[in-house]
Amino acid sequence: QTGRTPISAPPTGGESARTRPNYVPNTQQQASLERLASFYQPNDQQLPTTEVTRPSDSADASSTVTNTTSDSADGVTQNLTPTVINTTTPAITNAPMCRGTWVYPSSSFHAADAQAAAKTDRPNSSFPLYAEADYGYYDNDTYAELSGNVQVNQGRQQIAADKVVVNLQDGVAAAQGNVLLVDTGQSGATPVTSRSDIRNVEGGIITVADEVAYQTDSSKATARDVAFASVPLQAHGYAKQLNKISESQYQIDEVMFTTCDPVNPTWKINAKNIDIDTDTGRGEARGATLKVKNTPILYLPYFNFPIDDRRTSGFLIPRFGFSTDGGVNLQTPYYFNLAPNYDATLTPSVFSNRNPMLTGEFRYLTRDYGAGNITGSYLPSDRQYNDEDRSSLFYQHRWQSKDIPTLSAEAVYQYVSDSAYFNDFDTMDSLNTLGNQLNLPRRIQANYYNDYLTALAKFETFQTLSSDLTGNQEVLDKDKPYYRLPQLSLHYKLPWIEKFDITGVSDFAYFKRPIDDGSALEQSAGRMFNKITAAYPINRAWGYVTPAVSLQHLYTQYDQETVLDNNYSKDNKSKSIFVPEYSLDMGLNFFKAGSPSDKHFTGGYQLISPRLKYVYAPYEDQTDVPNFNTRLASLNFPQLYENSWFLGYDRIPDNNHLTPSVNYRYIDGVGLTRLDASIGQRIYLEDSRVVLDANQQPINSGRSATVMQLSSQPRQDFWVDLDGAVNSDGSLNYYNGQFRYQPTNTSLYNLGFVKRRANEFGQKDLSAITASAIFPIRNGWSFLGTVQYDNDRSRFSDALAGVTYESCCYGLSIYGRSYYNELDSTDKPTRAIMAEISLNGISNRRSGRLSGLMSDRVLGYNQLQSF
């Protein structure tokens, strides 16, 4: 085969590299594997503080390992307790289930030169060459020989052997007897401190063989019957022949490769040949067979895989699963590394109960104009959806100014063919972040902020989906949200007035809702809202007092088309309202040093803060003012101190109320807030009269429910968040809570609940429970589960449970999921069973669908370590 010949034939014989593959290690390879095990640092063995020299003969080499069994999976040792462990790699924190870590041997001299070489991209041949041996001969013309404990160092490369012979005319050298060839690669300036860090090293290989030929004036080398280990990839194997043809390229023939422990590896790849390029970060295997426990599982004529964390073109790990609607499905994504600043992924999906589907994603990054991504999918004539075509499109672009870092912009476009799309297809992560939304926003907006101004300019429209909740009919145009074409919002603070805080809000928008179905007459208008507030804060250690006065103005004007269509008079064409507002906010601080219970906590301080706020604003009739996008806020503790229950600028509330509350906090000696509890209530001195719509009743209950909230961290691994409200008659208004317990870095438990009664804020009854658990079982197996239970419907709205197995070299996930489409009122859930397999070194453990689902649903999941 062209381009795969060695640079020079080794000094002694050996069969051709093109003979029939033989993947069982021969005697020479067996000996090389045993010696290679000397550089596998067991987890429970500390790194040596003094250097031990390399064995000088095969007898010593064999003594470095014990209990060798020739019938093990690859003839590797069963007991790794080497006496020869030389390492320049710092102590490495190993992934769980790994018995050890591949480490570089140390150099007995010129270590500073080797470290400097690893941090530069200079050719290795440009560094000086150093050598030492027990005996040397040099004829000053054509021949040089070193023998007896030979060590040769040049830049990033080390060679140790019993004998080295050099042809001075062509620069070809031959190393014989217990040969060790080490290339530490380029690691940059960042030291290796963890098992994940070593993947940042480009290149890096340990080679053990009985004889090696190499060129002294280049990076070329050839070894036969060789065992090798990649420190950056934490992989090892053996080969009939290994050729290093440049600084970054390796050609390996008749090879076994695995990232598992060297003792009975769970999986391995046997290949006719493998090409590795550390410049591109990829490997190419031809005639490859994946074996699990020596059983052939998959044959691949060609396989492209990563050797580090850089992105390059190639197949990603396929996904396989089963669902009640789609049946068996298989997704085989292919990644295109088109350029450093843009790439693409194309994913064909095959379903047993549907037609094939094609999904594509394109990502790009520009120098001055931001970054974005486009994701689209198409499935023709879906057999599970009345033979209708199914499709989706998502586009997002983000930009941030380099000259003005606080200036940014974003563009978003979303489209799906039907409301069931999210329920049926969960392969498009960009769209999945939106959830089951009835109205999908499409917008262009720009943002700017500084110390005194926050500004937003936005154009926004929506795609409104049909839903069973609307009778499975198209939503009437009159019930769709208004477009904002455009909206400009300013929040500002005037800086030049001492002692006074002058702040303001200005919001300008044109609202349009096209009516094409005749469901109502179109009512489009411009709206302008302004509010300016002058406050005089008095802050002292004992507390604070803040009087404030505001002037609010709301102006709306219908456009000419709306005026003509609705026959509005001149008086009804526009509406202008001015409303003043007065408030007084005050609070006290009572400090006490020490903890509330010396038995459980020490040090720190306690703080009790009573607070009282009064707000007054007169009533102005707003019956004829349209409501474009304003709604009522939910009842909770922070909302008690807002001056308005309205979220939006279509209403200016009338206020005459008083809000008392008290807060207690304990901060311990190390700065953790162990307890933060508050209780408060709003007292209406006068019934409010401004409402959102004519059919809504005003809030006139005399006083609000008593609202409470509590956050606590009683232990380092336990968190509690509670809040709720009780009506004046003692009945429940609402309560919800969240408990999180994380006893270890690999286990997590969550329990959440919410209960709410229908109230004057337009909120409906709600009762639900959420729970999740992640914990290791044993021997690498872990359980993952999360449920959402709807008490009102007496059903699990979303349930997921599965097991994962993660070892040093592969991961397996099997899980099932049952869930309802929230836009579908039927009682038929979608059920799916999925399986995912990842092989370390050629895939990412946390890139699977299961990790994405758990990350979206489980608080604290992303902080867990791999099991």
Task: Place the predicted regions along the sequence by residue.
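Outer-membrane beta-barrel proteins and related beta-barrel translocases across Gram-negative bacteria
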Residues: 29, 35, 104, 180, ...
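N-terminal amphipathic/hydrophobic interface segments
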Residues: 3-253, 268-271, 276-287, 346, ...
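Accessible peptide chain termini
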Residues: 1-3, 532
